[in-house]
Curated annotation (Swiss-Prot):
It comes from Vibrio vulnificus (strain YJ016). The gene is rsmB. The keyword GTP-binding does not apply. The active site is at C372. It holds the Pfam family NusB. This is Ribosomal RNA small subunit methyltransferase B. PANTHER family: NOL1_NOP2_SUN FAMILY PROTEIN _ ANTITERMINATION NUSB DOMAIN-CONTAINING PROTEIN (PTHR22807:SF61), NOP2 YEAST -RELATED NOL1/NOP2/FMU SUN DOMAIN-CONTAINING (PTHR22807). GO terms for cellular component: cytosol. GO terms for molecular function: RNA binding; rRNA (cytosine-C5-)-methyltransferase activity. GO terms for biological process: regulation of DNA-templated transcription; rRNA base methylation. S-adenosyl-L-methionine binds at C251, A252, A253, P254, G255, G256, K257, D274, D300, D319. It catalyses: cytidine(967) in 16S rRNA + S-adenosyl-L-methionine = 5-methylcytidine(967) in 16S rRNA + S-adenosyl-L-homocysteine + H(+).
Length: 426
């Protein structure tokens, strides 16, 4: 299929149908040549990143919106506008390929309209670009409800957060310590002419100067290295697992944190629990590539009686289901799929899982509560509420008035993440 047509289909699936980009994009990639996968990804990610600006420009250039069965052609116009405004593709190629996309989408009669809209944008680009950022939705390209949360929670930092969310994310690696230490792998990258730098805190993290195909990484197929953001790798630092312990990774998919534990310690057993059977397949695949073994269980963390084997855990990593507002730069569709009311519902779910997991922790054991969110309701407020109702919970490494550590997007080039460490008093 024409790449621009495929991109329009992805935008339609995400924006109009509410499907996630992580589902829609791989499906679309199956319809195009492998060499075009990166181009399709760049167009889809970029168009979703700057969606309100593109929508406002399209609205100015069209007499009436395309509706119903023609909605996919509306998204094709957005694809064309993104290429012209944000990519280095020659204008004639961007316009020509986008117009041809209408043919691939079985709308040849709309080719003239699409061509006219894109040509008019070229003629009036400066004025239209200025108009597209003249309102908050276009200036910050975040939904108003999320912008308000960020402004209230981070009055001095919200603009930095927004900027980080709108930037492309770097590619972080986690070196498998069972094969190489980080300095050794850094040298392997250097030998392969791959520029990279170390992280100051995450002991196995390396940041690439530019993203690359994983198969070009030394020893990827042999399990020497994995792709994982440095903020997620810090889960190991906070959990501090020891040899011989019984450890639970709750809400474990896709398995990066489970693997990190196994790469670093000889636990008696690591249990990887998740309620999504399809996502658990990723856990199994990742462990297989890394030649690691864990007990993988499909079950609801709120109902341990369905899967628990009767022995409490020494350590529990609770990477709770969350709004994922800390990883928007990696998943720009979150801005348009998430709703304000989702935060309240997720906080309730987190609370239920928190209580259920605490009962599975040994006296003297450690539970690390983690999210990839930056909303206080899911993080600081969640932990405060848990401490208030759980006398045996002792907070470690932070103050009760401001529990845990909130990593903001872009901090040391990391994703947004939250960690709180709790010990169960005997």
């Amino acid at each position: 299929m024409n790449v621009r047509a495929a991109a329009a289909n992805v935008l339609y699936q995400v924006v109009d149908r509410g499907n996630s980009l992580s589902t829609a994009l791989p499906e679309a990639q199956q319809s195009i040549r492998p060499r075009d996968h990166a181009l399709l990804q760049e167009i889809c990610y970029g168009a979703l990143r700057y969606l309100p600006r593109l929508e406002s420009i399209a609205g100015k250039l069209m007499d009436k919106p395309l509706k119903g069965k023609q909605r996919v052609f509306h998204h094709l116009i957005l694809v064309g506008l993104y290429q012209l405004g944000h990519m280095r593709i020659p204008a004639h190629a961007a316009v020509g390929e986008t117009v041809e996309g209408a043919q691939a989408l079985k709308g040849p009669r709309l080719r003239g309209l699409i061509n006219a809209v894109l040509r008019n944008y070229q003629r009036e680009q400066q004025a239209l670009d200025e108009f597209s950022v003249s309102h908050n939705a276009g200036k910050y390209v975040h939904p108003s409800w999320l912008l308000k949360i960020l402004q209230d929670a981070y009055p001095e930092q919200w603009q930095t957060i927004v900027e980080a969310n709108n930037n492309k994310a770097p590619m972080w690696l986690r070196v498998n310590h069972a094969h190489h230490d980080r300095d050794e792998y850094l040298q392997l990258l250097k030998n392969a002419n791959i520029d990279s730098t170390l992280h100051s805190e995450a002991m196995d993290a390396i940041k690439l100067a530019a993203p690359c195909d994983v198969h070009s990484l030394p020893g990827f197929e042999q399990g020497w290295v994995s792709v994982q953001d440095a903020a997620a790798q810090l889960s190991f630092n906070y959990l501090q697992p020891k040899d011989g312990e019984l450890i639970l990774d709750c809400c474990a998919a896709p398995g990066g944190k489970t693997a990190h534990i196994l790469e670093r310690v000889s636990a008696r057993e690591v249990v990887a629990l998740d309620c999504d059977e399809q996502r658990l397949k990723r856990v199994t695949e990742n462990l297989k590539r890394l030649n690691l073994q864990a007990k993988v269980i499909c079950g609801d963390a709120r109902n341990p009686e369905q899967w628990w084997q009767g022995e409490q855990f020494d350590r529990i990593l609770l990477d709770a289901p969350c709004s994922a507002t800390g990883v928007i730069r990696r998943h720009p569709d979150i801005k348009w799929l998430r709703r304000a009311e989702d935060i309240t519902a997720l906080a309730q779910l987190q609370s239920e899982i928190f209580d259920a997991m605490w009962a599975q922790l040994k006296p003297g054991g450690t539970l690390v509560y983690a999210t990839c969110s930056i909303t206080p309701m899911e993080n600081v407020e969640q932990v405060k509420a848990f401490l208030a109702r759980t006398p045996a919970a002792q907070l470690v490494g932070s103050e009760r008035e401001n529990p845990g550590r909130q990593i903001l997007p872009g901090e040391e080039d990391m994703d947004g993440f939250y960690y709180a460490v709790l010990v169960k008093q005997a």
